[in-house]
Amino acid sequence: MENGDIGDVILVRCYSQDPISIIEGTLEYAPRSGGQFIDMSIHDFDLIRWLTGSEVKELWATGGCYEFKQYKDWDDGDNVSGLMKMENDAMAFFFAGRAAAHGSHVETEIVGTRGTLRIASVPTDSLVEVMSQHGVCRECYQDFITRWHDAYITEIEEFCDCVATGRKATPGVIDGTQSTKIAFRCKESFLTDKKLTLE
């Protein structure tokens, strides 16, 4: 992207799905959580701002309680999605779900004027593919701790390096604040079914 190989960003698409195997813990935590937009999609909002190099101009969020109706009691959904129009006219789509049968699935796609990048379109936990009379099988990550293990270590190392060297961390406080604003506006859009500006 930095070399311009895919051209200007047209669309960023983010998927974040928790595995069904952890749904009991997710449901136990849900009443005191921030909900899908604040606890889960906020990471995609960080990515969208970074990958488009722009701020959100308008957004609309929707979703529902497709499998776990109790999310309605918490003004939330078990599956939510949304569309965003960025200030530079790029578009963004995000989806967050709580019950992926195949495991933890986090995927990003960036569509540009001259090409497309897909990151983790199949959430495999190894480079091994099993080919048999049943077809091709690739094992998927079954939990987010395993999926994000290396990222967590890198994050801690980066933080420690910033403290040790006095270097300012990026992304910074403003980035976190912006993503939080987006999350709250998405929640409001979800509850009111209205397209909103970021304000």
What kind of region is each of these model predictions?
Residues M1-W74, D193:
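Predominantly a Rossmann-like dinucleotide-binding segment in NAD(P)-dependent oxidoreductases
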Residues G7, A101-G103, L191:
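A cross-taxa feature marking solvent-exposed loop/turn segments within ectodomains of secreted
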Residues Y15-Q17, V122-T124, R147-A151:
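Short coil/turn segments
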Residues G35, I42-D46, D150-E157, I174-K181:
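A structural signal for well-ordered alpha-helical segments within the folded catalytic domains
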Residues F45-D125, I153-R167:
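Contiguous beta-strand/loop segments that form the cofactor/metal-binding neighborhood of enzyme cores
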Residues E87, D161-E199:
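C-terminal helix-rich "cap/oligomerization" subdomain common to oxidoreductases
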Residues R138-R147:
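C-terminal "lid/loop" region of Rossmann-like NAD(P)-dependent oxidoreductases
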